[in-house]
Structure formats: C-alpha cells, structure tokens
Regions:
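Residue-level signature for short turns and capping positions that connect secondary-structure elements
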Residues: 74-75, 164, 179
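Hydrophobic alpha-helical segments within soluble ligand-binding/sensing domains
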Residues: 121-124
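Short, glycine/charged-rich beta-strand-loop motifs at protein surfaces that mediate ligand recognition
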Residues: 116-117, 165
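Single conserved hydrophobic/aromatic residue that forms the stacking wall/gate
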Residues: 174-180
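Nucleotide and nucleotide-moiety/phosphate-recognizing core
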Residues: 1-116, 126, 130, 134-141, ...
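Active-site-adjacent mobile loop/cap segments within catalytic or ligand-binding domains
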Residues: 155-171
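Pocket-edge structural micro-motifs
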Residues: 71, 161, 176
Length: 180
C-alpha cells in the first residue's frame, strides 16, 4: 500500500504542496503545489488553515493513512525549513514526505512521479533536500509549460503568469493541475 501505518504520532505521511504565500502569487505557475493541496483539502472537506511548522496545515485520512497536508508559508526557496521541522516533529522518514511542485519541462497539466533524485534546478526542492538531508523522497511534478523562448527569464515565466496564460496572448486559465 502506498500509505503505510508506522508512526506513533498518528501522522504517517506529509503531503507538501510548494508555492509562495500571498495574493500576488495565488494562481501563478509556481503555486501549482498549493493549488493541488487546496484541491485535496476541498475534496476532503477540510480547510488548510492551521499555522504549524511555518506552514498552513491540516490532517486528513487518505488511503487509510493519517496525512498532514502542508503549504509552507516560508516562500518557495525556503520550503525545506517547514518540511524539515514537521518531518522531525512527527518522526516521518523522507520516503514518507510527498512533495508536489511545478515543472517547467512538462506541458501544462502533465504529471511526472519520481521516487527521489536531484532538485533539477528547482530551488524549493533543493532546500527540502538540504533540510531532509537526502534527495530520496517521493515527488509529483506538475507541468506548467515550457518557457516561450530559452532566453526568457525563469522567474518571469513562473511567477507573474497565471496557469494557462501566455505572456504574449491571453488564453483560458486552468482551474487546477491535479491528478484525478
């Protein structure tokens, strides 16, 4: 079974959506992790509003396991601070920390699931690797589309534009990018 009951605290998994806090970033490409956590929480009918471990959190039961949903409020590049703190508190091993992040190498909405590996240039993942002390944690990478041109600044691509919106032309915004 994907979720495994083995934590004395009751929380068996951390499911972390990466993003940046605040209205300015709410529906941007970089916040697809937050959007995914919001979708899971909505489906489970629980708000992710409790501030713990420098993250908005709540617990849900998924697949028979108690899961802590997290949206770090440390900003993307410092997400590891929140993830590491919660993992240590609940004694959750890295292989039970599932991280959902954006991926600019994938088409919008396409998913890539990995057991572990490098940060691939993603600073949020890099910081989590640093704080967990390993790159061996599962992750779901959600495609947010490639930059329109190789010279296009990455921050200008993932931060100011809503999902489904191209800087040169308006198109329909995606409701969310999540696996069904």
């Amino acid at each position: 079974m994907f979720f495994n009951k083995n934590r004395a605290s009751g929380v068996e998994w951390l499911v972390v959506g990466l993003g940046n806090p605040g209205d300015k970033y709410e529906n941007t490409r970089h916040n697809v992790g937050f959007l995914t956590i919001d979708h899971i929480a909505e489906e489970q009918r629980v708000p992710v509003q409790k501030l713990k471990y420098r993250a908005l959190t709540n617990t849900v039961e998924l697949g028979g396991a108690k899961v802590l949903l997290m949206k770090p409020v440390t900003y993307m590049n410092l997400s590891g601070e929140a993830v590491g703190e919660a993992a240590r508190f609940y004694k959750i091993p890295a292989d039970h920390v599932l991280v959902i992040s954006d991926d600019v190498s994938l088409p919008i909405g396409k998913l890539r699931i990995r057991k572990g590996g490098s940060a691939g240039g993603h600073n949020g993942l890099k910081n989590i690797i640093q704080h967990l002390g390993t790159d061996q944690f599962p992750r779901v990478k959600v495609g947010v589309g490639e930059k329109p041109h190789p010279d296009y600044d990455m921050a200008d691509w993932v931060l100011p534009h809503e999902l489904g919106e191209h800087p040169d032309r308006k198109s329909t915004r995606l409701n969310s990018s999540h696996a069904k």
